[in-house]
């Protein structure tokens, strides 16, 4: 499962094809994009920000396109910045009704959050109700992650039951799993696997993960939200054009294939 493929010439060519042609409208100012570490989708290594989505966004700076300024923040703060109009883009993000109130969503891939644990003899879990009935199962979740109303309702119930620890990022969750402090988490498998790939303290868990889909957490869309309040109409249109071009090209799905082993993507990420 462990894979360290990175920015290949084939992927670079696909990204290059996304560059705007001469005459297309450029953004009127630098586009402010705070990001949070999200597996291999967004990798924060000191002052360096890289990964599937930073690779994509940097193609928007070429020629007469949009210059993007990336900065690293915790996920919960990222959500707050977007909701208050201080982030021009929220990426990556699953489509949810709450976020729809603040931005225009552009889908880039299909995704699904799953119940993730270390392989064991525990009885299978197929629904939220079954998870709630297994009262001995304690979870760690990332503060700021949102996979829709069913996820939020589950989170509220787990908090009431005292069965959840909220963490700042997926790596912190992975360390709790390894320590046995918690039994499971819920997120897109690529996120927690990506965090494990880049940290030797938890890398040995990669081949021991158990992925289970929950009926109430079906397939949805993941992509980018363009802020409704932070940008003018012309800049919103320019970003929407660039992101929709990326969606049509399939470059984001190709990026996932370059960064992740098939076992991580199966059942949780697929192309549009």
Language-model-detected regions and their locations in the chain:
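Extracytoplasmic small-molecule ligand-binding "clamshell" domains
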Residues: 26-101, 166, 259
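Short loop->beta-strand "edge-of-pocket" segments that line small-molecule binding or catalytic clefts
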Residues: 27-43, 128-147
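Periplasmic-binding protein-like
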Residues: 35-39, 111-113, 203-240, 262-272
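Extended ligand-binding regions for polar small-molecule ligands
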Residues: 54-63, 129-138, 220-257
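Ligand-binding cleft/hinge of the Venus flytrap
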Residues: 57-64, 133, 143-167, 174, ...
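Ligand-binding clefts/hinges and TM-proximal coupling segments of bilobed small-molecule sensing domains
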Residues: 67, 144-159, 238-272
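Acidic, polar ligand-binding/catalytic clefts
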Residues: 70-133, 144-147, 213-217
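A ligand-binding cleft/hinge motif common to bilobed small-molecule-binding domains
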Residues: 77-83, 93-101, 153, 183-208, ...
């Amino acid at each position: 499962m462990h894979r360290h493929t990175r920015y290949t010439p084939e992927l670079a060519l696909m990204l290059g094809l996304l560059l705007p042609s001469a005459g297309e409208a450029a953004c009127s100012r630098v586009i402010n994009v705070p990001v949070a570490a999200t597996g291999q989708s967004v990798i924060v290594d000191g002052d360096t920000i890289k990964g599937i989505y930073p690779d994509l966004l940097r193609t928007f700076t070429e020629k007469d396109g949009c210059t993007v300024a990336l900065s690293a923040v915790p996920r919960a703060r990222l959500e707050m910045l977007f909701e208050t109009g201080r982030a021009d883009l929220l990426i990556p993000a699953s489509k949810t009704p709450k976020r729809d109130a603040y931005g225009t969503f552009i889908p880039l891939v299909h995704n699904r959050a799953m119940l993730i644990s270390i392989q064991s003899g525990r009885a299978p879990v197929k629904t939220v109700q079954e998870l709630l009935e297994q009262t001995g199962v304690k979870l760690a979740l990332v503060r700021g992650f949102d996979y829709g109303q069913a996820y939020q309702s589950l989170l509220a119930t787990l908090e009431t039951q005292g069965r959840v620890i909220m963490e700042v990022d997926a790596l912190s969750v992975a360390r709790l799993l390894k320590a046995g402090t918690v039994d499971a988490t819920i997120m897109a498998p690529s996120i927690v696997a990506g965090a494990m790939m880049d940290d030797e303290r938890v890398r040995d868990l990669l081949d021991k993960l158990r992925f289970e889909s929950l009926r109430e957490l079906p397939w949805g869309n993941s992509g980018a939200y363009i802020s409704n309040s932070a940008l003018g109409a012309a800049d919103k249109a320019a970003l929407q054009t660039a992101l929709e071009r990326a969606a049509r090209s399939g470059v984001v799905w190709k990026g996932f294939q370059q960064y992740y082993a098939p076992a991580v993507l199966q059942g949780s990420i697929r192309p549009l």
